[in-house]
Structure formats: C-alpha cells, structure tokens
Amino acid sequence: NGKTDPGCRVRVNCHAVPGVWQYEALAFKPGLVMRWFRDGFCQLEKQQAEATGKDPYYLMDKEAAKVPAGCYGMMCTFSDVMNFISWKHASPTFTNFELDPEKFSRYTFYRAILENTAMVTKGHLELVKEATGNMPQEIVFAGGAAKSPLWCQIVADVLGLPVKVPVVKEATALGAAILAGY
C-alpha cells in the first residue's frame, strides 16, 4: 500500500503496475518558464539556432555554463516547493542582482532559472523522503530536461546525486508502449 502524506505535500498515485505507487511532488513551471525566457529574451539564439540547425537551448546553455554557480548571488523564484491541495505558486521574481551587465546578462538570469528548478527538486525530494523514508540513489532526467547537460549537472550538484539520461529521452511514449505490453 502507498503511504499517504497527511500534509498533502506529496501526491500518492497508483501506478499502472498493480502494487506499485508513485510519489509525486509538483513543480509546474520549470519548462514553461524556460520557454517563456527563450521566447521573450533569446531571439538571437532562436535565429542562430534556425541558421545552424542547433537547438536554441543548447546555445543558451553554452553561454549560461560560463556564469558561476550561484549567479553572483542573484536568486530566481519561478517555481517552488508546493502543497498540491492549495495549488499556490510563488510569485515570479529575480532578486539580489545589480545593474552590472558584465555579470548580470540574460545568461545569468537563465542560469538562475535552472538553479531555481534544481533547488525545487531538492525540496521535493526531501518531502518524498519525509513521506516514505526513502531517498533515491540517482535521478533520471527525461523529456526536455534530458537535452541539457548543464541542467543535469546543476541538479546533480545541488542534490549530490548522479543524474542519468536514458538513450530514449522522450519517456512518455516509451512508457506507454511498455505498459501496453505489460
């Protein structure tokens, strides 16, 4: 049986496989925020990507990797550890930055978004551990996140856990196919 979290901080879902439970902590905005940032502030990268056949996120990551961890003290809050019953989200903010374009370029802001998602992931894992007594030994990134070595590394550094990326990065279709044959 799946143990529920009385505080409703972790959602417990039955799995498609009988007797298996999924503990889920929710962070709704990371992918949406990254798309918003790309579309709103990285037109140059989108144009370069179109011209070179590269993904714009690859180009953004390449530059954001040059920004030191911690983003010169700037913090981003777009997603937060949340209680899924209340569906409340943090107000989107960037704080503690200066008007120094050498340090605080769009890539610093982008990296701060990546770091925010890593901190939210850490908070969610701590909630799952409180609810279940278990902590994963590794993290598996799939979907869009799996395409970013920088994001994988930031999450690995924040969690102190290895982040693995499967060969098949689009896990939804693969999972559906596996379950269809189950």
Per-segment meaning from a language model:
Residues 1-54, 70-98, 104, 165-168:
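Glycine-rich phosphate-binding loop of actin/hexokinase-like ATP-binding domains
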Residues 4, 21, 145-146, 177:
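Gly/Ser/Thr-rich beta-alpha loop segments that engage phosphate groups in nucleotides
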Residues 11, 23, 62-65, 127-128:
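Generic recognition of flexible, low-complexity loop/linker segments
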Residues 32-40, 127, 154, 175, ...:
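Alpha-helical scaffold segments in soluble metabolic enzymes
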Residues 38-39, 45, 49, 129, ...:
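Residue-level preference for well-ordered alpha-helical positions
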Residues 52-68:
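Short, well-structured alpha-helical segments that form the helix of a local strand-helix-strand
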Residues 66-174:
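Activation-segment/catalytic-loop signature of the eukaryotic protein kinase fold
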